[in-house]
Amino acid sequence: MAKQIKRKRRPQIKINTFCRFTAAGVTKIDYKDIDILLKNIDESGKITPSRMTGTSAKFQRKLTTAIKRARFLALIPYTDKHKK
């Protein structure tokens, strides 16, 4: 029988350890506040996960619904600007 090779997992790096919305005392995330929404979207247009931003689960859910509403209303783009 062949020997099995044990693979070690790469440790995940957490960038922020606190929620910016909780620290600022925010109670509501509005889809019209584009500056906050764009800070939580990466270069390719994807929503940044909470393990990277440190956002709590409650505000991550509110943030994703606000981003999806803003995309639907064409306030923010679905993808990045494709440069030629």
From Swiss-Prot:
Q: Which GO terms describe its molecular function?
A: small ribosomal subunit rRNA binding; structural constituent of ribosome
- Give UniProt keywords alphabetically: Ribonucleoprotein, Ribosomal protein, RNA-binding, rRNA-binding
GO CC, sorted alphabetically, is: cytosolic small ribosomal subunit
Q: Does the keyword Signal apply?
A: no
What InterPro entries has UniProt attached to this entry? Ribosomal_bS18 (IPR001648), Ribosomal_bS18_sf (IPR036870)
Source species, domain of life? Bacteria
Its Gene Ontology biological processes? translation
| Family under the similarity heading | Belongs to the bacterial ribosomal protein bS18 family.
Oligomeric state and partners?
Part of the 30S ribosomal subunit. Forms a tight heterodimer with protein bS6.
- What does this gene product do? Binds as a heterodimer with protein bS6 to the central domain of the 16S rRNA, where it helps stabilize the platform of the 30S subunit.
Q: What is this protein called?
A: Small ribosomal subunit protein bS18
Q: Which organism is it from?
A: Vesicomyosocius okutanii subsp. Calyptogena okutanii (strain HA)
| Gene behind this protein | rpsR
